[in-house]
């Protein structure tokens, strides 16, 4: 077999891992972000905190990126232990911050909590959604290269037909994250004529057309390894995003934004019925002739074309979630209620997923069926609830230490029900000492360019080295240098105030 055939075989016929393990893996970076924020607050209070760009970059890289690289490789069998370790570290940091608090130092704990619940948080910015999208981008960047090395567990790779691999969540999670901040959600309504709105939607996808066609031409011209049952012969994820964007733009013109969940449920139920009671599933799996033909555009790209219905469902669910999470809330107590609600809905979706897998069909990314949509939405909501909780805890820590502020977190703003002098000090000193260097902010600013850069460097590494026969130590070195280089480029762009856009 040629090197290309060996690499293609290396990522085929895989069945994934458990839903629980993927969920644990998703929660881990949320806890890392929490500990990173608590450590910043603790360091600012206990010792002089270095605010140079190099120090901040190295800290973010070590606390946010390196743990993910290790989790997806050498410590993949100890995800639960990693979570417990980070939680214990975070609890210790919070304990130290509380006992060193500069505000309400002699006030009973009940009174401290009561005053904190009355504090207001900045409503125009939600760090949980930013962190969600960055986590998905970083995970994807690591996985697309790591999957070609033996050190990367095969159970985390994309599944062939049924199953829940960690990389299976990546594609659905990207759609969900993009939907939460789509123009419709940020604007809350379609304020212009339908024709102009559709025209702008069509114009907004042309960079994706360029990227999708460019990827297709490059892959075919250099003979790069492909997994044809993933999207088809010519299709790729850029084309899926294009179709989803256009279809959902049309749906959001026809249906009210706050009814997006009804549209999502309707589409996925009808799609699952079509898979079960029409020849649609047979066509998707075996082609129109039933023998796996790839003749004709539909047969050649049947997986990518048909599965877009599932991704449309996920997008509409993301729109509904974005409307709820980005809704302005007056006080911390309101955000606690919202976090509990998101967590409760996530649990409800996991229960529904179990019922569907037992009685209807297992999760299939290849088909993007009902179970897949439920799994992606449930996992996304669970991650989002962890990030919301982390944001609230960080806000509490900032509330305790006067003048502290964590980049990419909520700002505490004055509340009329809180002690006036303390509220003012929270605002003035925090703004005066506000750190401006943050890897999360940098990655969020240039997410598309980071994804493209990761794809290009992944291709270059695969073309220049034999990844299939690389040892564990060298794999970690390559992955670390790869992520360090990509993150550093994005970080420097952010320092210079540059956003790379192609439109």
From Swiss-Prot:
GO terms for molecular function: glucosaminyl-phosphatidylinositol O-acyltransferase activity. InterPro entries: PIGW/GWT1. Its main location: endoplasmic reticulum. GO terms for cellular component: endoplasmic reticulum membrane. The modification Phosphoserine is found at residue 415. The keyword Transmembrane helix applies. Glycans are attached at residue 13. The chain crosses the membrane at residues 22-42, 49-71, 75-97, 132-152, 161-181, 202-222, 237-257, 260-280, 305-325, 340-360, 381-401, 448-468, 473-493. It is a multi-pass membrane protein. GO terms for biological process: GPI anchor biosynthetic process; protein localization to plasma membrane. It is found in: Endoplasmic reticulum membrane. Pathway: Glycolipid biosynthesis; glycosylphosphatidylinositol-anchor biosynthesis. Residues 43-48, 98-131, 182-201, 258-259, 326-339, 402-447, 494-503 are cytoplasmic. Residues 1-21, 72-74, 153-160, 223-236, 281-304, 361-380, 469-472 are lumenal. Belongs to the PIGW family. Acyltransferase that catalyzes the acyl transfer from an acyl-CoA at the 2-OH position of the inositol ring of glucosaminyl phosphatidylinositol (GlcN-PI) to generate GlcN-(acyl)PI and participates in the fourth step of GPI-anchor biosynthesi. Required for the transport of GPI-anchored proteins to the plasma membrane. Acetylation during GPI-anchor biosynthesis is not essential for the subsequent mannosylation and is usually removed soon after the attachment of GPIs to proteins. This is Glucosaminyl-phosphatidylinositol-acyltransferase PIGW. It comes from Mus musculus (Mouse).
């Amino acid at each position: 077999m040629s090197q290309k055939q060996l690499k293609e075989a290396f990522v085929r016929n895989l069945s994934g891992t458990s839903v629980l393990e993927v969920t644990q893996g998703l929660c881990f970076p949320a806890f890392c972000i929490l500990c990173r924020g608590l450590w910043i607050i603790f360091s600012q209070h206990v010792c002089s905190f270095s605010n140079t760009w190099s120090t901040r970059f190295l800290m973010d890289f070590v606390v946010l990126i390196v743990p993910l690289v290790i989790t997806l490789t050498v410590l993949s069998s100890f995800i639960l232990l990693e979570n417990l370790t980070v939680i214990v570290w975070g609890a210790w940091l919070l304990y130290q911050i509380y006992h060193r608090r500069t505000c309400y130092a002699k006030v009973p704990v009940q009174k401290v909590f009561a005053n904190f619940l009355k504090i207001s948080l900045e409503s125009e910015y939600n760090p949980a959604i930013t962190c969600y999208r960055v986590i998905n981008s970083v995970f994807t960047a690591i996985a697309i290269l790591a999957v070609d090395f033996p050190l990367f567990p095969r159970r985390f790779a994309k599944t062939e037909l049924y199953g829940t691999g960690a990389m299976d969540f990546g594609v659905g999670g990207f759609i969900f994250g993009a939907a939460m901040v789509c123009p419709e959600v940020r604007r809350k309504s379609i304020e212009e004529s339908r024709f102009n709105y559709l025209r702008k939607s069509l114009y907004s996808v042309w960079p994706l057309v360029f990227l999708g066609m460019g990827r297709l031409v490059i892959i075919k011209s250099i003979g790069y390894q492909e997994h044809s049952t993933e999207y088809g012969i010519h299709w790729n994820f850029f084309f899926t995003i294009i179709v989803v964007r256009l279809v959902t733009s049309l749906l959001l013109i026809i249906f009210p934004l706050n009814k997006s969940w009804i549209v999502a449920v309707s589409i996925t139920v009808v799609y699952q019925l079509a898979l079960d009671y029409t020849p649609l599933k047979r066509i998707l799996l075996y082609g129109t002739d039933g023998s796996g033909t790839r003749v004709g555009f539909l047969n050649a790209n049947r997986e990518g074309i048909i599965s877009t219905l599932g991704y449309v469902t996920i997008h509409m669910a993301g729109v509904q979630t974005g409307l709820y999470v980005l809704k302005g809330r007056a006080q911390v107590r309101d955000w606690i209620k919202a976090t509990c609600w998101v967590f409760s809905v996530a649990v409800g979706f996991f229960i529904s997923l179990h019922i569907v897998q037992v009685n209807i069909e297992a999760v299939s990314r290849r088909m993007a069926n009902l179970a897949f949509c439920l799994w992606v939405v449930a996992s996304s909501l669970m991650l989002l609830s962890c990030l919301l909780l982390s944001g609230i805890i960080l806000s509490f820590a900032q509330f305790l230490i006067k003048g502290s502020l964590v980049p990419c977190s909520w700002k505490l703003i004055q509340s009329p029900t809180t002690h006036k002098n303390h509220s003012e000090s929270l605002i003035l000193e925090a703004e005066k000492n506000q750190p401006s260097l943050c890897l999360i902010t940098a990655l969020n600013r240039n997410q598309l360019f980071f994804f493209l850069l990761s794809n290009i460097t992944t291709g270059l590494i695969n073309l220049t080295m034999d990844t299939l026969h690389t040892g564990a130590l060298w794999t970690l070195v390559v992955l670390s240098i790869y992520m360090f280089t990509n993150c550093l480029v994005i970080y420097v762009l952010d320092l210079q105030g540059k956003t790379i856009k192609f439109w």
